[in-house]
A protein has these predicted regions:
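Beta/alpha (TIM)-barrel catalytic core signal, keyed to glycine-rich beta->alpha loops juxtaposed to Asp/Glu
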Residues: 1-180
Length: 181
């Protein structure tokens, strides 16, 4: 708080925060931004989005494509075997069991993507932006064309019926995903 008052910093944020810690920290010095995992497959912090709106805090969602799983580009941990530095090699969403669960969701996303002539990633991001317009997703991208494609998700206006269908399916699904609680 002193650093803000002295003009040494303009704002501050917290990463991977829970509601109790956020409220306690915010009471001492108003938090400007939080950064937590959030995607169709990782929704355990969803209640924090409402808390952030209540407290006027920006929510930045990292891993918004579940470390690439929601793109449909990867099919198993073997997709990462040639890159020993790629930490996704050990993520549960790419295990045999994890991929079965992920593929069930990808079927739903692909169905909607075809309707909008969009990619799976674009639909995943458009869903997130529709539900929480004040949330800022930061999908990781290693290639410029994917970055550009992801950016176009903001131009996709999903219909309420598509959102309801996706949400209905998500309510019936459980995922094995990195960072899960």
């Amino acid at each position: 708080k002193d650093l803000i008052q002295e003009g040494k910093i303009k704002a501050w944020g917290i990463s991977e925060v829970n509601e109790d810690y956020l409220r306690r920290a915010h009471a001492i010095c108003p938090v400007t931004v939080i950064q937590n995992r959030y995607s169709m497959m990782a929704r355990w912090h969803e209640h924090l989005i409402d808390v952030c709106q209540e407290l006027r805090i920006t929510y930045i969602a990292f891993s918004s494509l579940a470390n690439g799983a929601l793109t449909g580009a990867y099919h198993s941990q073997a997709d990462f075997k040639d890159d020993q530095q790629d930490f996704r090699r050990n993520m549960p969403q790419y295990s045999q069991t994890g991929m079965i669960k992920t593929n069930a969701l990808l079927e739903v996303i692909s169905q909607v993507a075809k309707k909008y002539h969009a990619t799976n990633a674009q639909i995943s991001l458009a869903w997130m932006l529709y539900k929480f317009p004040h949330l800022i997703p930061i999908p990781g991208s290693r290639k410029v064309d994917r970055l550009s494609s992801n950016f176009q998700a903001g131009n996709i206006q999903l219909l309420e019926t598509d959102i309801q269908m996706i949400d209905h399916q998500l309510e019936q699904m459980e995922f094995e995903v990195f960072g899960g609680h």
